[in-house]
């Protein structure tokens, strides 16, 4: 179009877009600031946080640590697990539809590697992975709104992603619907994981991660809740 300044128009549109985005961000932050603050209870699986009884949204603060811990994967067999909160799976996060979630991810100084978190309950690419990629000794904080009810996985998305997940960096986030959930007698939190060790099944001593077994999809262990016998014997789940 003759006489039309496309560059100026583009700059004006960009400025309007930036202003709208800034205004929206400020508005969301202001609304969240007015909500009651609740610190998420995190418990070791197979336990999980209690059902939500409140009828209104809240600002839920989740303090999650990344811990690289050596412990038994089977009797006499040890393994270096990479975990959220020191457990496999990582401790369940439980929020309500409409909640604003403020997630603090701390990578302990004793760890050796960078890690992050990708929550599939988060809208947008990466699920928070880009905002939370941190080296040992650092902490990242990001905020999101729980928009859609459902049960979602979360996991570390640091490359190589498969290795971080196979070493135990996965868990669940439950977004309860606004109307709540049906009452049940008991709730348990169970996830299956594949583990790939250099030694054979139940080979004694400290076993390392075997990348070739992982590539070939030939796990040494297929476990519930990260350990051989985690849900049997004295750890059996009761009805």
Say what each PLM segment does:
Residues 54, 174-191, 199:
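Low-complexity, Pro/Ser/Thr- and charge-rich linker/hinge segments at domain boundaries
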Residues 10-24:
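Bacterial N-terminal signal peptides
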């Amino acid at each position: 179009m003759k006489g039309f300044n496309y560059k100026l128009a583009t700059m004006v549109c960009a400025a309007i877009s930036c202003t709208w985005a800034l205004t929206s961000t400020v508005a969301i932050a202001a609304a969240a600031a007015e909500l009651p603050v609740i610190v998420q209870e995190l418990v070791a699986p197979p336990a999980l946080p209690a059902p939500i009884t409140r009828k209104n949204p809240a600002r839920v603060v989740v303090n999650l640590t990344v811990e690289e811990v050596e412990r038994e994967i089977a009797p006499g067999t040890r393994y270096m697990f990479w975990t959220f909160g020191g457990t496999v799976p990582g401790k369940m996060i439980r929020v309500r539809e409409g909640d604003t979630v403020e997630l603090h991810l701390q990578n302990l100084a004793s760890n050796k590697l960078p890690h992050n978190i990708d929550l599939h309950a988060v809208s947008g690419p990466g699920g928070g992975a880009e905002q939370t990629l941190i080296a040992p000794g650092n902490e990242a904080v990001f905020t999101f709104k729980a928009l859609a009810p459902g049960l979602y996985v979360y996991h570390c998305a640091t490359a190589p992603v498969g290795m971080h997940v196979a070493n135990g960096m996965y868990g669940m986030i439950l977004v309860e619907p606004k109307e709540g959930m049906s009452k049940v007698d008991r709730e348990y939190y169970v996830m299956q994981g594949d583990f790939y060790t250099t030694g054979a099944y139940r080979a004694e001593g400290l076993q390392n991660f075997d990348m070739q077994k992982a590539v070939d999809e030939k796990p040494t262990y297929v476990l519930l809740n990260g350990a051989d016998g985690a849900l049997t014997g004295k750890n059996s789940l009761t009805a």
